[in-house]
Structure formats: C-alpha cells, structure tokens
Amino acid sequence: MIGVCFGGYCPLHQGHLDVIMRAKKETDLCYVVVCGYESEPRGEDLGKDIKQRTQMVREFFRGDNLIKVISVNDTELGLDESMSENNWRIWTSYVKTRIPESDDLIFYVGEPRYTEDLKKVGYNSILVGYDYFRGCRVNDISASKIRENPLRWWRKIAYPFKPGLTKKILVLGTASEGKTTLVQDISKYFQIPCTTEFGRDYMEKSCMLDPDLYVKDFSEFLLGQYRYYCEALEDRGNPGVIISDTDNLVTLMYAKAYLGNPEMNITEEDYENILVPLAKSLHSLISWDKIYLIKPHNIFVDDGTRYMAQSSMSERNKNYEILVNLLKEFGLWGKVEILNGTYFEHFEILKNYINELYQV
C-alpha cells in the first residue's frame, strides 16, 4: 500500500507531520506531494515558490527511505482554485502518473472536506488528527498562522523553513562605538545567535593592520561576513531572531574611506569594479528586518588593532556619512533607527524591540 500526503507546505509544520508520520507508519511507502499555484499569495508571503518549497521538504526528509517527495504545479495542470470535482479528478489522475507504485493508493489528509472530495473521484482516504467536537485539528496549527506570527509557533516549524522566517537585526556604526559589546550582550540576554565582524577576526588571525590590506582581503571580508550571516541563520539553536555586528556595508565604508590614502593599498578601480559589484551580489541574498545605526560619540579605544589615523571625531563623522549614503544606495534606509544615547540606553532599545517581536 502506498500512502499519499499533499499540501502547499508554506511552511511545512508539525500539523503536516502528524499526517505524514502516520502515513509513513501505516504504509509501505509514503509520497509527499508539494503542490500549489504560480504567484500564489501564500508562497509569496513565505518568499518561496513551489520549486523552492519542494527542495526544502526534500531536505527535511533526506535520508528517509520510506518517504519520497514530488511536486505538482497546479497552474501547469490548468486548475483553478475552485476545488471542483473536475479539478480533483485532473489532479489525482496526474498524481497517479507520478507514482510508479500506484496500484494501491490511499490518501492521508488533515481536513474533513478532503475525504469527501477524494471519495467522489474514487480514492480512499484517512483523516488524521481532527477533533470533530471542537471542529478543528488536535494540533491546532496552520501555515497561515505561522506566516502571520512565526515566532509564536517557532517550535512547530520544520527546520529548513526557519532561516527564511527568522527576524534579522543588524547593528552598524563606525569603529569603537560599542557595537560588538551591544550585540554580544543582546545575544546573551535572549540566547540568540550573533555574528561578529569577520574583517576584524580575519585581521587578528593574520596579524594584519589596516595598511597591510589589499583588495583581495576586502573581498575576503565581504565573503566571510556573508558566511557568518548564513551560519547564524542556519544555527540549530536559532530561536527565531539573530543579531549581527556589522555587515558588508561596513567593509565598503572602510574601503571607500581609504581611497586616496597613500598608506593604503586600494584604488578607486578596486572599489568600483571589484568590491561594489561583489557587495551588491551578496546583498541580493541578505535581508534585514531592523537596522540600528550608532552615531559617533564615544572616546576612540586603541586596542592595538584599530587604525588610529581615523580615530578623530572628524574622521569618524566622515565614515558615518559614507555609511549613511551606502545604506541609502542599497535601499536599506527605511529600516534604519539611529542610536545616539548611552550604552545602556542602546541596550534597552534593542531589548524592548526583541521583546515586542516575541509578544506579538
């Protein structure tokens, strides 16, 4: 006997898994059918089309020999969203052609109406986890509830879908403004993943100072910072929020500030032809929900690694303006909140913002 489960999986969650796991336990093989329409609102809300969702569901069940994942594009089948008997007949006939072992199919479903619809087109089905007395599923979760408030239902979301639903916070500023301490303190307070400044880690590991840097090093900064971002998102301990200490715009800020400085090994051509295109390419893969920009205001701390020629308030203000312009150039200014208070005030602002995320 072959079990069939189906859904849009926008995202895959425990309610779906209740159905899939029962089918897997009661049949010889379970087919999970990822279905949906092109340009449908639920997929667009999630930011994942049917091909991407199919890949993510496959990733989740990777290594499970009792489950096979296939996709059905309802738009390509010419179906509308009426759930008519004719649509069901077309859809089930197509699904049957996709399953080689299709002589004895049984559908496992989570909605009562599906059992009636499938019966009309000649298929048996088993309703899983539905409470008729209450008129809802026993595990009362839905993809629409998750899309509306992912953090509330975080533990019920399948892992591959979590990075795309994570709230991502970025802290930016010039050197010696308390970014690293702020990010680390917030990370400890909420026990959320954080990223450090890759460029600084790279330079400390290589025993380099700013005048030792070439364009290849700045390129490494851009790629390394992106890797840090991905690692934080994919952290299994990610509880739905991550916070980052700087991103690629800070690398561009320093590179641009060093142009024309005879102590530095970077040219206008390096910046415009190599660094900016690379940063823009990586930027297309990154998103931020909130950006905090710290204004220059503190005493510059010489920790033995910072470039002291840029320690004056005048130079730091110039770098700050470069950063502001980059945020605007990259279309991020609308997400920016400027911080211009004390260390504790900054901490409280971020703490309150994250608390609000979890309380919605």
Positions of PLM-derived features:
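The conserved Walker
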Residues: 175
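Hydrophobic positions on the alpha1 helix immediately C-terminal to the Walker A/P-loop
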Residues: 182
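A glycine- and Lys/Arg-enriched "phosphate-lid" helix/loop adjacent to the NTP-binding pocket
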Residues: 258-328, 337-341
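Conserved glycine(s) of the Walker
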Residues: 178
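Glycine-rich phosphate-binding loop used to anchor ATP phosphates in small-molecule kinases
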Residues: 220-285
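Hydrophobic anchor at the beta1->P-loop junction of P-loop NTPases
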Residues: 171
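Conserved substrate/cofactor phosphate-moiety recognition/catalytic segment
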Residues: 188-230
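Nucleotidyltransferase catalytic core that binds NTPs
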Residues: 1-166
